[in-house]
Amino acid sequence: MRVNNGLTPQELEAYGISDVHDIVYNPSYDLLYQEELDPSLTGYERGVLTNLGAVAVDTGIFTGRSPKDKYIVRDDTTRDTFWWADKGKGKNDNKPLSPETWQHLKGLVTKQLSGKRLFVVDAFCGANPDTRLSVRFITEVAWQAHFVKNMFIRPSDEELAGFKPDFIVMNGAKCTNPQWKEQGLNSENFVAFNLTERMQLIGGTWYGGEMKKGMFSMMNYLLPLKGIASMHCSANVGEKGDVAVFFGLSGTGKTTLSTDPKRRLIGDDEHGWDDDGVFNFEGGCYAKTIKLSKEAEPEIYNAIRRDALLENVTVREDGTIDFDDGSKTENTRVSYPIYHIENIVKPVSKAGHATKVIFLTADAFGVLPPVSRLTADQTQYHFLSGFTAKLAGTERGITEPTPTFSACFGAAFLSLHPTQYAEVLVKRMQAAGAQAYLVNTGWNGTGKRISIKDTRAIIDAILNGSLDNAETFTLPMFNLAIPTELPGVDTKILDPRNTYASPEQWQEKAETLAKLFIDNFDKYTDTPAGAALVAAGPKL
């Protein structure tokens, strides 16, 4: 660690932060460990040491993102390009903010950070040097600095020496906005972005994921405008260099299924796809830990050691962790640097073009098959639909599975209209000759979740090509091509109708789900391209 690295309090004054008496610049993991466990710390700043060697922290009531508190400054930069919450048919979280309110929020955060001892972490978002963002994170909380050191790409000493930030993130978790009502905002908490100033402000929420997903939203704005796919997916590569990407919302299996001992991990959540291939945005993983076991997910379990950072888990007095306890939240998490997983792409998290594109869905209705092979039009239809069941706890206030449609399997992070992401993805897939599949990691007629063992065998069949050679039949209403048998998979579950006491039970639920799909897709029918895709969806 080089304290300050020549970064002076005067430089922070350019952002409006004054009277800083100490800057801890790009702290080492050892220093962060000492800082987090400092016995003089109180509240959510203080970490607890666990028996696995990782520090655990609490994020208070903010155990997930706060999408209702997300704002983007509407000005000449963004007015005509952003996908706004108050325009068009599609619902999203991109609420406009006036430049005046932005200045007020910025004043609150800079006042909070002024006169303090600050942690500054410079890191990259994006493994491709041509398109990466150089991001400077500023916080007064040691574990928040640890979180971004884990999650973003750590620069070399040479890269740090010439580091010039493209984007500034100021985390003022301890401050809130008392004037929120007069300003027409959702609450006293805020996560705000300004594309002209290239800055993110955080106030009121302690959730680390706001910094991670904030930069994802920015990459989702900048890259597609350059013709580069920006994707909420995990990715891995096989021995022959064959790349697979796994799209899916939180809790559908992206991290679990891409962390495969037979394949090298590119990354578990956020990727781009350009002329050279698929590349990670991040330098770490952010895995869910609820009900984590060493037997079911050994790679993730073994990644929880010194330098990993646990969030909202229950730590017993002896330092052991109760991974089954979801009393604080179902969205318990761990962040760790990607090299905590043994089988990764080195030295840079990128590989060639993807040939297999897998859409993960967790169907709470028990209607969709465990796997189906999609046509080109079905690929676009299901990508724009982004169906899953919201699983407990990744957003505040959601505890039971409820059906949701999230465009591009990541509507919360989209900055442009969903059709722009679909167009770029389709172009990349066509150029690479990629095939798409819909994989249901959710429930079936038994009321039980499809086992990880069966899902892994299905993924193996996709990746080794045996699914493409399998005989298929068509599931009515949804018109999906389903294999009649697959090695290592219980044949009985391949047709979801067989998991019900009677086919009529499936039919009834299927009609309900089909109607939800049709109603949701209506928002895309105002364009000729969208209207043409209706035929690829379910029919009643």
Swiss-Prot record:
Involved in the gluconeogenesis. Catalyzes the conversion of oxaloacetate (OAA) to phosphoenolpyruvate (PEP) through direct phosphoryl transfer between the nucleoside triphosphate and OAA. Its main location: cytoplasm. Binds 1 Mn(2+) ion per subunit. GO terms for biological process: gluconeogenesis. Substrate binds at R65, Y207, K213, R333. It is found in: Cytoplasm. Keywords: Acetylation, ATP-binding, Cytoplasm, Decarboxylase, Gluconeogenesis, Lyase, Manganese, Metal-binding, Nucleotide-binding. It comes from Escherichia coli O1:K1 / APEC. It comes from the Bacteria. It is an enzyme of class 4 (lyase). This is Phosphoenolpyruvate carboxykinase (ATP). ATP binds at residues 213, 232, 248-256, 297, 333, 449-450, 455. Its cofactor is Mn(2+).
